[in-house]
Amino acid sequence: MTNILSPEKIENDQELPIRPSYLQEFVGQQQIKENLSVFIKAAKSRNEHLDHTLFYGPPGLGKTTLAKIISNEIGGNFKSTSGPAILKAADLAAILTNLEKNDVLFIDEIHRLNTAVEEVLYPAMEDFELDIIIGEGPAARSVKITLPKFTLIGATTRLGLLSNPLRDRFGIPMRLNFYNTEELKKVLNRASKLFDIDLTDSGSEEIAKRSRGTPRIALRLLRRIRDFAAVDGKSRVDKEISDFGLNRLEVDHIGLDSNDYRYLKFIADNYNGGPVGIETIAAALSEQRDALEETIEPYLIQIGLLQRTPRGRVITIAAFEHLKMPIPNQSHHQFNIFNENE
């Protein structure tokens, strides 16, 4: 699922020129920044490596950026890979043996590591040792290789899919949360200076309110609104051109697009608001379950239009009101579901 409001990184996203390099430049996630600053200073004062760190939460909130910032702050090299790219234990061994002291190894989508790779990672994280089997059959022998003290940073949008043994080996787990409007305005204002865009306060607020609490989406929308302004002969991005451009992009006043409406209307029209299983929704909308769970559902839940329950997905009364649809008489089913969870 690729669209203007996807929190996933897409090919034409230009984040590198505006990516902050140090914690003091990073906007939002204040508690995470403050805690990381303490942990980094403490590790440096003891001349130790930073504890292995796990960032989790919806996509587009800055997990990769924070990993690079940590690397800059502790003065190590930054090595990046992803769970799907490490197919076998030998792939991980090759990466680990090329690390130096204080290096940061960033593994995106770490929940997608297979079991064989995880088994190699455990002693590397705990004891900084790598067990390698040399030879085959009766002649095979195990050789231990000592690794330099490095910091592993994992990132995942699906914490529940991370195995317990792997999750427990991270000394610093941190959840990234959606941004509020004021934080997104700061992100946009910083980017507008780097992109040389004349962005007014009302323009940045309009874009921020419709960016689904996600900096990556806000920056993408800013670039598209700049295009509308340029073609319309406007030298600045104000509220008027922002509203015009966002309407053309079919982004409504709370950040919903056609995919969100398809999702909500399917449950409203066919299941009277729910509950309905995610597999049924995915099949009906011809979408992958993962795409719905990572791209659409988190924001709908955040703004109170959707709930996940043991019996399936349920849209709220607020969702019916936003869709301008009559609230079904059976709306008491939502309260029955809450009671089951108590």
From Swiss-Prot:
Residues 180-250 are annotated as: Small ATPAse domain (RuvB-S). InterPro entries: AAA+_ATPase (IPR003593), AAA_lid_4 (IPR041445), DNA_helicase_Holl-junc_RuvB (IPR004605), P-loop_NTPase (IPR027417), RuvB-like_N (IPR008824), RuvB_C (IPR008823), WH-like_DNA-bd_sf (IPR036388), WH_DNA-bd_sf (IPR036390). Residues 1-179 are annotated as: Large ATPase domain (RuvB-L). Its main location: cytoplasm. The keyword Amino-acid biosynthesis does not apply. GO terms for cellular component: cytoplasm; Holliday junction resolvase complex. GO terms for biological process: DNA recombination; DNA repair. Residues 253-342 are annotated as: Head domain (RuvB-H). Pfam families: AAA_lid_4 (PF17864), RuvB_C (PF05491), RuvB_N (PF05496). ATP binds at I18, R19, G60, K63, T64, T65, E126, D127, F128, R169, Y179, R216. Homohexamer. Forms an RuvA(8)-RuvB(12)-Holliday junction (HJ) complex. HJ DNA is sandwiched between 2 RuvA tetramers; dsDNA enters through RuvA and exits via RuvB. An RuvB hexamer assembles on each DNA strand where it exits the tetramer. Each RuvB hexamer is contacted by two RuvA subunits (via domain III) on 2 adjacent RuvB subunits; this complex drives branch migration. In the full resolvosome a probable DNA-RuvA(4)-RuvB(12)-RuvC(2) complex forms which resolves the HJ. Has 3 domains, the large (RuvB-L) and small ATPase (RuvB-S) domains and the C-terminal head (RuvB-H) domain. The head domain binds DNA, while the ATPase domains jointly bind ATP, ADP or are empty depending on the state of the subunit in the translocation cycle. During a single DNA translocation step the structure of each domain remains the same, but their relative positions change. HAMAP family: DNA_HJ_migration_RuvB. The RuvA-RuvB-RuvC complex processes Holliday junction (HJ) DNA during genetic recombination and DNA repair, while the RuvA-RuvB complex plays an important role in the rescue of blocked DNA replication forks via replication fork reversal (RFR). RuvA specifically binds to HJ cruciform DNA, conferring on it an open structure. The RuvB hexamer acts as an ATP-dependent pump, pulling dsDNA into and through the RuvAB complex. RuvB forms 2 homohexamers on either side of HJ DNA bound by 1 or 2 RuvA tetramers; 4 subunits per hexamer contact DNA at a time. This is Holliday junction branch migration complex subunit RuvB. It comes from Rickettsia felis (strain ATCC VR-1525 / URRWXCal2).
